[in-house]
UniProtKB/Swiss-Prot annotation:
Keyword annotations from UniProtKB, A to Z: Isomerase, tRNA processing
Reactions listed under catalytic activity: uridine(55) in tRNA = pseudouridine(55) in tRNA
Source species: Idiomarina loihiensis (strain ATCC BAA-735 / DSM 15497 / L2-TR)
Record-given protein name: tRNA pseudouridine synthase B
E.C. number(s) listed in UniProt: 5.4.99.25
A matching Pfam family: TruB-C_2
Family the entry assigns: Belongs to the pseudouridine synthase TruB family. Type 1 subfamily.
Record-linked InterPro entries: PsdUridine_synth_cat_dom_sf, PsdUridine_synth_N, PUA-like_sf, PUA_sf, tRNA_psdUridine_synth_TruB, tRNA_sdUridine_synth_fam1_C, TruB_C
A biological-process GO annotation: tRNA pseudouridine synthesis
Active site, renumbered: D49
Enzyme type, top EC level: isomerase
Presence of keyword Cytoplasm: no
Molecular function terms, GO-annotated: RNA binding; tRNA pseudouridine(55) synthase activity
Length: 310
């Protein structure tokens, strides 16, 4: 096998549900998975802070075309907040900027977290990956450069108080895309009057994907020593990313048209008026995503024909 072909990698498609280790950037974790699988192409569905652990769906090959659907999905986190200390980054990796005595109890915390449930405008931390004039905000923060603060509308669906011990509060948070848990914890600390920062963060759900299916880098590395068979067995199909979309089944003739970018008639769907559909063959082979227009399914994102085994 030529060196050029080795560099090109394998043309495989699927999703790895990685449990990102603490202290590693999401991009570093992504590159580790890509190398282990020797994949041609890889991407993830939304970064986690280096401090955080938990579900990081890594998309390989054609699955990268559908990563946006999980970027836009709801997320769930288990977070530990340390009360009494604020930091520059609102987590344990930042410098301490304020310390105050903690005089709260379970009832006070339970009442405070209710204030953050629902739709609200949130100002992300200046130590975030959001862009300003093409650079992430953390670039300006590290240079000591002030930039205009922008708010974004987010929704916190629920917050459950799991535990309080000394100055540590553990919460389970379900929220919309774009929610910064560090900012939420900092705001909670301000409301309690003592300050707070994130000391542990674990993402335990993305859309309807739960943490039970996660694998670690150590598990992947062990399997890689034996070849690709064990690794490939852990791949989930690309349509795992599309659980929120209804599915429509198409015939063999319609499959050919769809893969060539042609619209196909929208079958009767018992009143379902969804604008986007997950398209599959009669044998449950995933083909892509279609958008409805004039009672037809128009291909929006399609698995490349060479990756479809008809």
């Amino acid at each position: 096998m030529s060196k050029a072909r080795l560099r090109k990698g394998r043309a495989l498609t699927g999703v790895v549900l990685l449990n990102k280790p603490q202290g590693m950037s999401s991009n570093h974790a992504l590159q580790r998975v890509k190398r282990l699988y020797n994949a041609q192409k890889a991407g993830h569905t939304g970064a986690l802070d280096p401090l955080a652990t938990g579900i990081l769906p890594v998309c390989l090959g054609e699955a990268t075309k559908f990563s946006q659907y999980l970027l836009d999905a709801d997320k769930a986190y288990r977070v530990e907040a340390t009360l009494g200390v604020r930091t520059t980054t609102s987590d344990a990796e930042g410098e301490v900027v304020e310390e105050k005595p903690v005089a709260v109890d379970t009832a006070k915390v339970a009442d405070a977290i209710k204030q953050f449930i629902g739709e609200q405008d949130q100002s992300p931390s200046i130590y975030s990956a959001l862009k300003h004039e093409g650079r992430p905000l953390y670039y300006y923060a590290r240079q000591g450069i002030e930039v205009p603060k922008k708010t974004r509308t987010i929704t916190v669906h629920s917050i459950e108080l799991l535990n309080i011990q000394d100055n540590k509060v553990t919460l389970q948070v379900s929220c919309s895309k774009g929610t910064y848990i560090r900012t939420l914890v900092d705001d909670l600390g301000q409301l309690l009057g003592c300050g707070a920062h994130v000391s542990m963060l674990h993402r335990n759900a993305v859309a309807d994907i739960a943490e039970a299916a996660m694998v670690t880098l150590e598990q992947l590395e062990t399997l890689a020593e034996e070849g690709y068979e064990g690794l490939d067995a852990l791949l989930h199909p690309a349509d795992l990313l599309l659980g929120q979309l209804p599915e429509v089944t198409v015939t063999q003739a319609q499959t050919r048209d769809f893969l060539h970018g042609q619209p196909i008639p929208l079958p009767e769907q018992n009143g379902n008026d969804a604008e986007e559909w997950r398209v599959a063959t009669e044998n449950s082979l995933f083909l892509g995503v279609a958008r409805v227009k004039n009672a037809e399914l128009w291909p929006r994102r399609v698995i490349a024909r060479e990756h479809v085994d008809l």
